């Protein structure tokens, strides 16, 4: 008998991996290619950054100005000097094609102002009087709008006053007409009384005259 293993032994020992479908294999190769390309780009960027950050060859270093040198080295300033020595030196990433200030807001993530500035759309207005003063000095249309509102208010007040005066004048006229009617009625009554008194006086005179004539006639007889 031969010592060579049979086909069954070979199949059991070195079983091949099942072949992937063509679509999955193509996708896997694309993913590997993309990762390789990204790694190459990252290495290239690192090389450029390190190249530009390195000093030119043959540079003789002199006394370098350290950021902590702006604070005098006296007792009590150790914490501030240490903070400046380990402070970050890189600035913010700037947007491409925009000329902005070297600052970025933490709230709205926009460039050109800091957190808490009045230019921020998320700025919380505090003192209303100070805000009105600022708007009046910064916005040229503020005075015109305020004058227009004041003029409209004055016109409305004048209209209401005119309506009130008209209503009061109508009431006065009605009251005056009623009082005039009462006075006329009183005058008529007075005239009637005066006429009655005159008539009564005339009657009394006539009676006296008749009685005097009758007395004279009786005396003559």
UniProtKB/Swiss-Prot annotation:
Biased composition (Basic residues): 184-212
Primary localization: nucleus
Region of interest (Disordered), residue spans: 1-76, 147-221
Positions bearing Phosphoserine: 212, 214
Biased composition (Basic and acidic residues): 1-10, 17-29, 60-69, 147-156
Pathological condition linked to this protein in its record: Retinitis pigmentosa 9: A retinal dystrophy belonging to the group of pigmentary retinopathies. Retinitis pigmentosa is characterized by retinal pigment deposits visible on fundus examination and primary loss of rod photoreceptor cells followed by secondary loss of cone photoreceptors. Patients typically have night vision blindness and loss of midperipheral visual field. As their condition progresses, they lose their far peripheral visual field and eventually central vision as well.
Protein name: Retinitis pigmentosa 9 protein
Lineage: Eukaryota, Metazoa, Chordata, Craniata, Vertebrata
């Amino acid at each position: 008998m031969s010592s060579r293993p049979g086909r069954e032994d070979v199949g059991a020992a070195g079983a091949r991996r099942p072949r992937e479908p063509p679509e999955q294999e193509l996708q896997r190769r694309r993913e590997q290619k993309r990762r390789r390309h990204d790694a190459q780009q990252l290495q290239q960027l690192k090389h450029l950054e390190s190249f530009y950050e390195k000093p030119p060859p043959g540079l003789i270093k002199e006394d370098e100005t350290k950021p902590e040198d702006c604070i005098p080295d006296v007792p009590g300033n150790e914490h501030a000097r240490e903070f400046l020595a380990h402070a970050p030196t890189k600035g913010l990433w700037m947007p491409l094609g925009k000329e902005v200030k070297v600052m970025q807001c933490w709230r709205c993530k926009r460039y050109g102002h800091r957190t808490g500035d009045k230019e921020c759309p998320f700025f919380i207005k505090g003192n209303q009087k100070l805000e009105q003063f600022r708007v009046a000095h910064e916005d040229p249309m503020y005075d015109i709008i305020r004058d227009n509102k004041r003029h409209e208010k004055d016109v409305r007040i004048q209209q209401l006053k005119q309506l009130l005066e008209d209503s009061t004048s109508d009431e006065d006229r009605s009251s005056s007409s009623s009082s005039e009617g009462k006075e006329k009625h009183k005058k008529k009554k007075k005239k009637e009384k005066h006429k009655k008194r005159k008539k009564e006086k005339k009657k009394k005179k006539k009676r006296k005259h008749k009685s005097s004539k009758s007395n004279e006639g009786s005396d003559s007889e």
